[in-house]
Amino acid sequence: MPQTDKQICIPPELPELLKQFTKAAIRSQPQDLIQWAAEYFGAMSRGEIPPVRERSERVALSNWAELTPELLKILHSRVGGRLIVQADELAQMWKVLNLPTDLFNSVMNVGRFTEEIEWLKFLALACSSLGVTIAKTLKIVCEVLSSDHDSGPPRIPFSTFQFLYTYIAEVDGEISASHVSRMLNYIEQEVIGPDGLIKVNDFTQNPRVRLE
């Protein structure tokens, strides 16, 4: 095979382009991610505005139930505490709740899930379709994961929050790993009590906690 000295040049703006693409995909939640990606980058190459739709602009079909934290809580209870769930089983649970198929497919595509799905990652991305910011997304996740038997504000183990915040920030792509680390260190050292739990108010009403 003939060799060539030609090198592939990666433009310095590529990482930022991919970050914006990922965020746009989460907001738009296309049913066919490949087709949508082709339209997205095609528009950018022509200097046009990419086909990004905000959640409020998506057409709600009357035969589908609207995704809500309450329905996600039901879905979480049916997962039954498992960390890994099979894609076909989760798809069936989703269908039974009459939730939009395009949203399920979008979460699968954005999360790059295959046959075995990490449930907390799937849940985080599903909640991101409801939350405008990372803080609001984590608030919804916390409410979904919090046990109904607990009195007081919703709360989850700090280790779970740490995993979710790190993952959501990574998918978002606009928050540095160093910022995430600083916030987590502050919360762990200054906020978390002996029970090892974090409450919603700990990261939504504390002026020193800025997740974004």
Swiss-Prot record:
UniProt keyword annotation of Membrane present: no
GO BP annotation list: cilium organization; flagellated sperm motility; protein localization to cilium; regulation of protein phosphorylation; sperm capacitation
UniProt modification remark: Sumoylated, sumoylation decreases upon spermatozoa capacitation conditions.
GO cellular component terms attached to this protein's record: cytoplasm; motile cilium
Residues annotated as domain RIIa: 12-43
Keywords tagged on the record: Cell projection, Cilium, Flagellum, Phosphoprotein, Ubl conjugation
Region of interest (Interaction with RHPN1), residue spans: 209-212
InterPro entries registered for this protein in UniProt: ROP_DD
Superkingdom of origin: Eukaryota
List of residues that carry Phosphoserine: S56
Subunit organization: Homodimer. Interacts with AKAP3. May interact with SPA17. Interacts with RHPN1. Interacts with FSCB; the interaction increases upon spermatozoa capacitation conditions. Interacts with CFAP61.
Protein family (similarity comment): Belongs to the ropporin family.
Domain-related comment: The RIIa domain mediates interaction with AKAP3.
Name used for this protein in its record: Ropporin-1
Gene source species: Bos taurus (Bovine)
Gene transcribed to yield this protein: ROPN1
